[in-house]
UniProtKB/Swiss-Prot annotation:
Name of the protein: Putative uncharacterized protein DDB_G0267840
InterPro entries: Prespore_vesicle_assoc (IPR053097)
Acidic residues biased stretches: 315-325
Disordered: region residues: 1-72, 208-237, 280-335, 531-607, 690-712, 738-801, 896-950, 1044-1076, 1303-1359
Lineage: Eukaryota, Amoebozoa, Evosea, Eumycetozoa, Dictyostelia
UniProt organism field: Dictyostelium discoideum (Social amoeba)
Low complexity biased stretches: 14-72, 208-225, 284-300, 536-575, 583-607, 691-712, 744-779, 896-944, 1321-1333, 1347-1359
Record's compositionally biased regions (Gly residues): 1311-1320, 1334-1346
PANTHER family xrefs: NUCLEASE-RELATED, SPERACT/SCAVENGER RECEPTOR DOMAIN-CONTAINING PROTEIN
Amino acid sequence: MDTIGLDETTTIEINNNSNNKHSSYSSSSSNNNSNNLIISKIPNKIIDSNNNKNNNNNKNNNNNNNKNNYYNINKSSKMDMDYLLDCVQKTHGLIKDLTDSMLISNDQEERKQFQKQLNESNNYLNELLSKLSYIKNNNNINNNNNNGNINSNNGTSFGEIKSIPLMSNETGFTNNKITNNFNYSENKNNNNNNNNGQEQHELFSTSNKIENNNNNNNNKINNENNNEKNKNNNNGQHIIPKIYISDHEMAPNSEFQNIDSISPSSQLICGESRLTPVSERNELTSPASSLPSLPSLPSSMPKENKENKEPINQQEEEEEEEEEDEQKKEEENNLVKMTTVQVENTQEKIPLAKSATISTTNKTIEIEEQEKGMDSEKLKKTIKSSSSSSSNLFNDFPKPFIPFVQSNYNTEERNEVLQIVKLIHYEYGVQIKDKTGQLDNYMYNINFNPPPQYMCNSNDINSNNINSNINNNNNNMSNNLKKKLLIISNEKRNKMGPQIQRSPEETYLSNHFDEEELSNYFSHSFMSPKIVKSPSSSNLNKINQNNQNNNNNNIINNNNNNNNQNNTTTNNKNKSNNEKNNDNNTVFNNNTTTTNNNNNNNNNNSSEKNKVIVFEKKEPGQFIFKKEKVAKLSTSLSYSNLSSSSSNGGTAEDEEYDRYYDSFHCVELVDEDLLVYDNEDIYFNDEVDQNKSPLISPSLSKSNTTTTTTTTTTTTTATYANVNANAIATIGSSRKINNTLSPNMNNNNNNNNNNNNNNNNNNNNNNNNNNNNNNNSNNTSPTLTTQENNGISNGSGNGGRKIHYRSLSHGIIKTPFTNNKLKTLQIFVPTEPYTCRLEITIEENVTVERLLIEVIDLCIKERRKIQYHKRQKLQIQQLQLLQQPIITTTTTVAVQSNNNNNSSNNNNNNNNNNNNNMTSPINQSQSLTSSTTSSNISSSSSSNAFSPPTVSVSNQLISNNKNGNDFESLTFPFLIYTNHRDFILKKSDENGEIDQTLQPIIRTTEIKKLKTDCFSLVINPKAIRDTTHHPQIFRVHIIHSSNNINSNSNNNNNNNNNNNNNNNNNNNNYNNNNNNNCNNGIVKSISFSNIGEVDQSSSSIAPSSSTTAATAATSSTTKDSVAVVYKSSSTLASIKASICKKENLELNLCVFMTMSNEVIQNEKITLVELNLPSVKLVYDQIKPIQKSITPFQSEGVVGNAPRPITKLLGPIFFFTPDNICEIKQYVVSKIGKLGVKKDRYMEISKDKIMYSQFDYLPSSSVSQNGFHNNNNNNNKEYYGGGVGGGGGFTNYNNFSNANLNNNNNNSNFGNGNGNGGINGNNGNNSGSNNKENGGTGAGIGGGGGLQLPNNNNNNNTTPLKNNKFFRSFSSAVIKTPYQLINDISGVGIIINKPNSFYLKCNNKNSEYSSTDADEIVAKIQFIIRLKKENLI
């Protein structure tokens, strides 16, 4: 075989498959360009002398070198190190993901598989590190060697010839020659003596069996040599072949330092691969099978030592030539096709491999050859084996890989807000050193990889700065977030493999957020919630709902049935607990958890306890309540079971209720987005004497649960202290709206309870009353305690679900946002009739003034929640009363007899019973004879829907009534002062008693300087005003525009009746309310604004009987009315702005109207000038434009409109601002060619133009005019008949600009034929085109109306003007003339469609397109964020 020397210029013509062009590469010995390809022959006479110990193996090595030839590719070893570094980073990421999956998994077999895969990954990582170490050492050796680099494979068989060893040094190529013969084999006898057991690198794959015999003969020598070489190779150092499978450009100047210091435990950020395998990728199967494969390399790389060269005998040369001749013959016999290589105008045939791909930095060269007679099946097997082994975890790069594979059902991209939050949690979680922080890190570790330009270079790869990208200052962390967000914005999730088992945490993190969750996540933090888990809450909700419906349908029968169940359950529980039951309503008991089984004494029958979750805002010290809603979760042991099954032991009825899950703490909640007050103060222990304080509960001082430990929760809670009985309750519960019975808050006398249980067959209603509403007061000194459980629970005691709490048992912790310590304080607030105790956790460096602001803000929020709770219950009552039949007299008599039996069985203890019989009209006789106050009577009157008391409770009632609904009577009279400067803070003892001798605390004092933890909020004496009488109230009734017309006539009479009732005494008020219940079926609630408190009995509203259940349901999200403190300087505009902000209404779509439905045009008028006791605020309605206002008020009106309108429509339009609408609504008039004027009504909302779909305003806003615009698909306009005559419009073409001044009668809008008046005939609805004959009629009213067909399809829309985006807002998809920003709950870009985006309204996505889609999306997202933050 002829050879080609390096001193000769070599030109190789190669067919490049990528571009089907010929490219020539030339090089010389002095050329060091990485793109040049040099083919030479290794001389037959080579002496391998690594050191003196290897001199005996030189001859064997020389013989082996003659049989294995390689390419010499001029690439620096730095490229090898880049490639290995990428592998190291990916392996680190794989190890981290496997570790996370193993910790999350609850299946033993799955954990074993993860452990096995983790071990394989660690072994592979060790191999990579050893190769890096070898390259480093080899480079050091080459730097000292100036005589060239002789490559010897030391007898190592590369098996299938997966790679080509590198031969290069700093000065370029050596002067040695290599043959043009390529020896590829399918040898399966790999080097088994390599320390790290590296895998075969599949750069080339061939099935040429010609060299099998040669390589098999070499393997014996190779193994012997390797055994000796490996003894001297302590680190298992290997060389990496310089073959790259990448179309990406590599980093040319990357250098690595401290390679030996890399350990498998080093935490590298997993980066994107800069290498894309040429072979086709397969789908990801498992992490273990996806390890990137590396070539098997020689165990040592001896360098040339010319001093130790020995001459080669002539006899050896002859033997070598004979072997070459034999090899040529074998090749010719096997029909190896020869590839032509031109060398200085001469042609020589060189045997090449069947397929070879050499990927350089920028270009890919392919040398292909087909073997004659090659079996196709064999070729397929070769290709299959190559592609399957080359498929690894890093397929489909440069996409980043994620820890959890997306499921098939979730095809939408993940919400950006969720990604941002989770990334923030990940960045903060990495900095935490304790175990709990690691668990948090596992939960929120999204592991999004930065792009290659952000990957750590060689300077970052050492043990000191492995995590430099994470553990640096805040600037670095924010930079990392920005880098990762770049990936999120451009990433579209595709499924990357088969489904895997998903835990609830994974399910939550992969789901989209709804509108409420988006707002919650802006204030998410690491604060630990105070939560006591109990699965019986949803069961309690269902039972309460059933009781509510059953009692309304048939009071006697259903009460008997319910009480039979209650009594049966009560008897069983009393026997099991030695006739000492702490909870009155044991039908709600759930014995499914081990907590109840081991804690029967104190909370066996307790339902859901108080749960208040407090999360810290971005600003330290600010708190917010938060709930997260996810799909219904199962408490089974399997994480993959995410169906809506009920809790362990729970009934199937639980499935109808949503469950809530705190993803950060892995705690399932049963609650809605608003917190509700609940009372859990009265829990007795069997060992506690009944005569002693009932407030000493072992459940509050020690933990009897089966979990290892539970948490101490420092959250913002509030407890009530009874003025007389000093009872204590806690603010906050996780209960649904209809969950108002709260049986766990009722304290039964066991003697009475047992007595009633013995007589339950005769007195069903009595037992129900006693089980739910008996309360024995024990006037003893209170012991203020809160729930305290110590430690951390990481086990699966709670239904098999992992629970993690952050330990706060030491009381003082550090927040992850700052280094400041947190301190828990108890603050007593002067609420009525109970004293409220707030427990707040805040930073130590916060001043007293800041603490006062937080306390006042919290009280305002709590008062809103109480009012919201009242409103919801009364609305439920309205819905159910409308559906109930009239109660007969027979029923009344039967119930009264039961009530009499009840009083006798209670041993005339009526003073201590709050007797709610779940009936409304029957309790009148009993309530009038009892000694309870009017609030108790009013409460029992509406107890059918669990109605709360409607007035402040007197001291006598406080001492006698500890019903669970007492919290609803809690008022905040001190909030008439909303400025924090009106309050001062004083030190107090643990019972809230203030030492009057002490001076108030200075407002600038820091919390950490105060020695005590108990304080009291006191109104500043300088701010006290005359509060002996309630201030005069100006009431604003909030009504939807669709409900305003239907209830016009009846509301006035009902409101007048209610105003008269307000002046009556309590009994008369009760009777009038009962009459209203019988006649109208509805009693609307009263709600307060933040300005002041009023007596609820002073202004109760009874709406009209025409109000339907649907109307009540639609108005459930908005208050019925708002009471405003009457001030002479208050204007309607300021009141409107305040109400719209708090009720989340669009300011521009709200109109003030009098109670007689007259629009109040001037909103700048004061209350004194208005001189009205109440007004209506009609929302979702456009204010009518007065006819006196014309589009041409002045000459210089052109350009008056804001820039968006001017830019959009141009100077052809004239704009007149509607001064009444506060420059928010505009009249747009267009002058046509013939001088015809068309008007449009437009509005500006958040830099977006929204305009109407009609030329005229709806009839609801201009009821005095006799026309109506129907916005349905038919687009018809109906006109009422004129006064005194028939006829109509004839030959009228421009009817859109019709003058309707003559239509003064009140016609029936929308019916198609207006009734002209008394005895008037119906109009004629038939006609052709624009010529219509109006109907003639006799009588006073004249003829009826006529119907004009709308032939102009575009007369109701604004000219398009090349703006698709704004036209889309008025499309049929949104179905509203104005697209409100409040309706948009989500917005995002559609990746697969350029210039397209979607809006999410009413849980439906609408797709739109615009040339500036990115700008539109950014603006709307910013608006949504601002609105959510304002709502928070």
